[in-house]
């Protein structure tokens, strides 16, 4: 499976590589290699989320950038305007990770906002509130926020959902090109157990990161 819009990026270098093949093998191979990398980047492998409704899964592939950011810190001021006393888990995506982002829980999109900002490296703490980003607020059990943050290279955020959409856990909700970070926030009062720690490798739609109260 491929992410939506993949053909717009893969087709041009693939076609150019095929056209150049009789005239210049090096340029042809360069174009075909670029097409192969882009096809790899836009891959969208199927994911099977755990059936347990109390398990919130990672919204992104990558490594855990931050274990928990306490409410009241500068990086969480924005999330505190959406949720009461949020706990946040942040995932950093490298260019080699799958970049399709997925819903961590079942819910309905009640707010979808694109916020303009800078293009600082995504691993910086201040990138969460100063970079270009998309904030998705979901009405679920519990309510939760997914924040897609662009980086120094990743400057394009595509959302697959809009306000009013119902999503299931593990369903694709967006994509950041090419790399960056995704934050998941839930109210502290709804958290029963944190299941991951800094440096852990996680997969979107599959790896449980938080157990919520039921």
UniProtKB/Swiss-Prot annotation:
One Gene Ontology term from the biological process aspect of the record = phospholipid biosynthetic process
**What is this protein's function per UniProt?**
Catalyzes the formation of archaetidylethanolamine (PtdEtn) from archaetidylserine (PtdSer).
Quote the cofactor binding remark: Binds 1 pyruvoyl group covalently per subunit.
Protein's organism: Methanopyrus kandleri (strain AV19 / DSM 6324 / JCM 9639 / NBRC 100938)
Asked whether the UniProt record includes Ribosomal protein among its keywords, one would answer no
The EC code for this enzyme is 4.1.1.-
The family database entries (PANTHER family) matched by this protein are listed as: ARCHAETIDYLSERINE DECARBOXYLASE PROENZYME-RELATED
What name appears for this protein in its UniProt entry? Putative archaetidylserine decarboxylase proenzyme
What does its PTM field state? Answer: Is synthesized initially as an inactive proenzyme. Formation of the active enzyme involves a self-maturation process in which the active site pyruvoyl group is generated from an internal serine residue via an autocatalytic post-translational modification. Two non-identical subunits are generated from the proenzyme in this reaction, and the pyruvate is formed at the N-terminus of the alpha chain, which is derived from the carboxyl end of the proenzyme.
The UniProt entry annotates the active site at 180 (schiff-base intermediate with substrate)
Q: Which GO terms describe its cellular component?
A: plasma membrane
Q: Which UniProt keywords apply?
A: Cell membrane, Decarboxylase, Lipid biosynthesis, Lipid metabolism, Lyase, Membrane, Phospholipid biosynthesis, Phospholipid metabolism, Pyruvate, Zymogen
């Amino acid at each position: 499976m491929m992410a939506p819009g993949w053909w717009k990026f893969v087709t041009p270098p693939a076609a150019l590589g095929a056209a150049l093949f009789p005239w210049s093998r090096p340029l042809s191979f360069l174009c075909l290699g670029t097409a192969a990398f882009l096809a790899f980047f836009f891959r969208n492998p199927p994911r099977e989320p755990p059936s347990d409704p109390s398990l919130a899964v990672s919204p992104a592939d990558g490594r855990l950038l931050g274990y928990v950011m306490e409410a009241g810190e500068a990086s969480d001021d924005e999330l505190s305007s959406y949720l009461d006393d949020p706990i946040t888990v942040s995932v950093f995506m490298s260019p080699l990770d799958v970049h399709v982002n997925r819903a961590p829980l079942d819910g309905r999109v009640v707010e979808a906002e694109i916020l303009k900002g800078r293009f600082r490296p995504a691993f910086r703490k201040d990138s969460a509130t100063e970079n270009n980003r998309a904030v998705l607020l979901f009405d679920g059990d519990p309510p939760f926020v997914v924040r897609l943050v662009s980086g120094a290279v990743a400057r394009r955020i595509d959302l697959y959902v809009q306000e009013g959409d119902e999503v299931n856990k593990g369903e694709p909700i967006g994509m950041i090109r090419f790399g960056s970070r995704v934050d998941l926030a839930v109210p502290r009062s709804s958290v029963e157990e944190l299941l991951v720690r800094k440096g852990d490798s996680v997969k979107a739609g599959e790896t449980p990161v938080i157990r919520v109260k039921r």
